[in-house]
A protein has these predicted regions:
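N-terminal "assembly arms/tails" that initiate or stabilize quaternary assembly
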Residues: 1-87, 240, 301-324
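Signature of extracytoplasmic/envelope-associated structural regions
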Residues: 4-5, 40, 44, 67-73, ...
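Long, contiguous amphipathic alpha-helices that act as assembly "spine/axial" helices in icosahedral shell
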Residues: 56, 81-143, 172-181, 254-277
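Short helix/loop capping segments that flank catalytic or ligand/cofactor-binding pockets
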Residues: 64-67, 106, 189-192, 198-199, ...
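Alpha-helical scaffold segments that mediate packing/assembly in large oligomeric complexes
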Residues: 101-172, 289, 295-308, 318-324
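Extended, solvent-exposed, turn-rich assembly/linker loops in the middle of proteins
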Residues: 139-219
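Extended serine/threonine-enriched, polar tracts that run as long, contiguous segments within proteins
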Residues: 184-187, 195, 202-264, 269
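Extended, compositionally biased alpha-helical segments that mediate assembly or anchoring
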Residues: 244-324
Length: 324
């Protein structure tokens, strides 16, 4: 990959250094990545020849009971069956001008500062995309949804008992759930009852928060509609991730006549961010462009369940934070 340069040198960026650092920091800066909810998966390797769908075959769970060994009875032979999970390839870009990046460029290590800045932007964009994706995908996994928002009075409100019920949606697999993503208003409700545990390092620095033993992820992008909040519970690796390579993942551009000379740093990424076990099954005409939009991934009609419900390590929990 060639080194990128600009006329003034303000955005003299070396992709071989910038890109790996930015990609690594994106996962670190995302709470979903830091908690282990998003994990890289070898089977999500993006084909080098492009294509908008990544197909992942898997073996179906074996069904049927054990059989009695009897000399007068033949054993029945059960079949191994396969199915497929399908993920969609996302293509996104971030573009900022040197005016927007002035503070980062003024520092002692401007390239590191730029990479940190872009990684933070990507982390926020990924979290937003993931929430839209979950809203669409989880609508087809009804076994993993608990909705108490329509109950009367305080029965519709998030509390410890209702949270146990949400966990129970996973049955005897509930111990696989390790994280909970919630709106800050939900976190505030829990904190008022002193049920948040603050996990700190040996120097007293806050590492993360926990609720009932599950790492708390707070994001005000979590859905709220008519006083109904959507909270998600996750297992490790519930969301699969893989990074592709656009033809030009990083480049600079210069407009010499704009504002006395404006430079731009363009970051392009091809990636998969996929709720494991819920396959991308787009309706006719989707995506309208080369890659799907947030609105398209939020549409339930573009998803279909692939795994058995308990093997999908996500639970959707709808509730209120005050009696209606």
């Amino acid at each position: 990959m060639a080194t990128l340069t600009t006329t003034s040198g303000d955005l003299d960026v070396i992709p071989e250094i910038f890109l790996p650092y930015m990609i690594e920091k994106t996962s670190e800066k995302s709470e979903f990545g830091a908690s282990g909810v998003i994990q890289a998966m070898p089977e999500l390797q993006i084909p080098p020849n492009g294509g908008d769908i990544v197909t992942m075959p898997f073996w179906q769970d074996l069904t049927g009971d054990d059989q009695l060994l009897d000399t007068s009875t033949d054993l029945d032979v059960a079949k191994f069956t396969t199915s497929v999970d399908k993920a969609v390839l996302h293509g996104r870009a971030l573009v900022y001008g040197s005016t927007d990046l002035a503070a980062a460029l003024a520092g002692s290590d401007p390239i590191k500062a730029l990479a940190d800045l872009y990684a933070a932007k990507w982390a926020r964009a990924w979290q937003k995309l993931l929430i839209y994706t979950l809203n669409g995908a989880m609508a087809v996994v009804t076994d993993n949804v608990l909705d108490i928002s329509g109950l009367s009075g305080t029965a519709a409100v998030f509390d410890a008992s209702a949270f146990v019920d949400a966990n129970q949606k996973m049955g005897d697999c509930k111990d696989k759930l390790v994280a909970i993503a919630m709106h800050s208003a939900v976190e505030a409700l829990i904190a008022k009852s002193d049920q948040i545990d603050y996990i700190k390092d040996s120097e007293g620095k806050l590492l993360y928060k926990e609720y009932q033993g599950k790492r708390v992820i707070v994001d005000d992008g979590m859905p709220v509609s008519g006083g109904v909040y959507t909270t998600y519970l996750f297992g490790l690796g519930a969301v699969g991730y893989s990074e592709g390579t656009p033809k030009v993942p990083l480049e600079t551009s210069r407009e010499p006549l704009l504002n006395g000379g404006e430079e731009y740093l363009i970051s392009r990424r091809h990636f998969v961010l996929h709720p494991r076990g819920i396959k991308w099954n787009p309706s006719s005409g989707v995506p309208a462009k080369d890659v799907p939009s947030n609105v398209e991934v939020a549409a339930s009609g573009n998803w279909a369940q692939a795994y058995e419900s308990q093997n999908i390590r996500i639970v959707q929990f709808k509730h209120r934070i005050a009696a209606a």
